[in-house]
């Protein structure tokens, strides 16, 4: 009888643990999608108002602009007039929100802008921004091309059809792996749809007909057009399973002893790249790029990938 009672007690305890685990998984996040995008709304309004005090910052907040640590008032700029293009992704479980935006300035110029916020306990603990103006990423510049937000970036995918958290990261990592190995015997193709569209600071580089020839994202890797590039300091700070979009932040450098295959890819860069993924394959890519020498830090710890120079 004691054994039966003991077994029953264990079963009840296990059932309790299972219910507890289920409750944790199904628990409402402290800050849901609307809440997190609300923090982004507040940030962008404070930017155009140039009023840092309106942003609910934690006392220990970490702020970077193009890899340089600074206070938020140093990361804002006086000329920001209004946001003319913006879309967001979130991770409710981890309190992350990231935005790609185009900011119209008072002088009529435009700024490409990526903002990543971490929210904990109702306060922003991390602010990471990448900001590029015309000429700061060579010829990659066409923010006027970004008007209506692509439907591929705004989906609400039903749970049964969603790629997993790590599945989204795997798709993005396949892209960097293809970039890293293209033109070599170790080349491994990326998980790209044949008609994948890529936008770099607004310039559409693939998924369109150019000079009578279709520009294919997979073909660029297949033909080794980016041989020698080193994709390092890789991070995946925001993963949105409902939207099917993952943000990766990386460094574009060169492998030791290699030269760029193209004048357009000569400079080292800090890049925020958003990947829209469907059933494990990349459908659309949006990147904010800023020229940053490999020797300069980003202020954040890498998660994966080779080191500087490809080591």
Label each residue range with its predicted role.
Residues 2-21:
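Gram-negative bacterial Sec-dependent N-terminal signal peptides
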Residues 22-311:
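C-terminal and inter-domain tail/linker signature
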